[in-house]
Amino acid sequence: MQYVVSTIWKHPADMDKDRMREVQAQWRENGNLVNIYWFEIDSTTHGSVSIFKSRDAFEANLALQKEHRKKSTDEYRITMTHEAQGECFAVLQG
């Protein structure tokens, strides 16, 4: 069963979407992930939905994820304001 993590992040100024795309691309080869979606809520806030292959894959990725989050906070002053996570129990595919 896939595992979904949804977060909201606050930036100190307008988002640098080009830099964010470069950062996100670093996760492309991560075998634990199915996909990551980042979306704009407003010019200084973005949402993220990360889909992992399973809860075990999420847990295997946790140390790397914590490291990335710390860097985002320490270097770029981006702060997480919300997190929700859980196993996916239904998927609508068109």
What is the predicted role of each segment?
Residues 1-47, 53-67, 74-94:
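Short S/T/G/P-rich N-terminal loop/turn motif that feeds into the first structured element of a domain
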